[in-house]
Curated annotation (Swiss-Prot):
Keywords: Ribonucleoprotein, Ribosomal protein, RNA-binding, rRNA-binding. Signal peptide: none annotated. It comes from Methanobrevibacter smithii (strain ATCC 35061 / DSM 861 / OCM 144 / PS). This is Small ribosomal subunit protein uS3. Part of the 30S ribosomal subunit. Residues 16-85 form the KH type-2 domain. GO terms for molecular function: rRNA binding; structural constituent of ribosome. Binds the lower part of the 30S subunit head. GO terms for cellular component: cytosolic small ribosomal subunit.
Length: 250
């Protein structure tokens, strides 16, 4: 059945992820992707320190490739290592960092708040850190720290929020660290973008019409000025003739 194949494939991916998580913990393991290609199986490993994943002369990569082929049954596995550009935005890496700080004896509140500041400083929209276990005494408890905006339910919380989990063994018992991060480039389904108003552009035809109107008005004004000048000349001529007639009569 197809459903059974999906379950088997998902179980295999989970086992591979757990193996790489344990093997590459010191390299800052940040997750993996498995891609089936015509030439075999491509396994993309994301790590904070790719050099430790590859090893001297490619020794670690060859050992991991043989394990994936023999123990997990991958067909011609090819490993590609990619560096995590911003480790603060990778929840799996940050969960490991929290576990390491707790193992060194730091207080869980101080660890959680410092981690949240680093994640938000990297540009995340929101972050949630959950630490569960015997953190205060002999009884188990849960401490949750939230900053910014983060989706808690529905399909966007699964598709848009990245999650990471780690465990650490302390004297009182095992602590679980759960980190959820909403990346800075996340666009929510209900987000609305308000566009700026558009400026109206006057067409060339309208400009020509306005210029023609202006020219006609100038022509009319020139004709009026000429008529006024002609009237002034007539008045001067009449005044001169009347003055001459007055002289003759005298």
């Amino acid at each position: 059945m197809i459903e059974k194949d999906f379950v088997t494939e998902g179980l295999k991916r989970t086992r591979i992820d757990e193996y790489l998580e344990k093997e590459l913990e010191r390299a800052g393991y940040g997750g993996m992707d498995v891609q089936i290609t015509p030439l075999g199986t491509m396994v993309v490993v994301y790590a904070e320190r790719p050099g430790m994943v590859i090893g001297r002369g490619g020794k670690n990569v060859r050992a991991i490739t043989n394990t994936l082929k023999n123990d997990f049954g991958l067909d011609n596995p090819q490993i590609e290592v990619k560096e995590v550009s911003v480790p603060e935005l990778n929840p799996k890496i940050m969960a490991y960092k929290i576990a390491n700080m707790l193992q060194r004896g730091m207080h869980f509140r101080r660890v959680a708040y410092s981690t949240i500041r680093r994640i938000m400083g990297a540009g995340a929209q929101g972050v949630e850190v959950t630490i569960s276990g015997k953190i205060r005494g002999s009884r188990s408890a849960v401490a949750k720290f939230v900053e910014g905006y983060i989706k808690k339910c529905g399909e966007p919380s699964i598709r848009l929020v990245e999650e990471g989990f780690a465990t650490v063994q302390l004297k009182p018992g095992v602590l679980g660290i759960y980190v959820r991060i909403m990346p800075p480039e996340t666009v929510l389904p209900d987000s609305v973008e308000i566009l700026p108003p558009k400026m109206e552009i006057i067409e060339d035809d309208e400009v020509v019409e306005v210029e023609e109107l202006d020219d006609s008005e100038e022509i009319v004004e020139e004709e009026i000025v000429e008529e006024v000048e002609d009237l002034d000349e007539l008045e001067e001529i009449v005044e001169e003739e009347s003055a001459e007639e007055a002289k003759e009569d005298s």
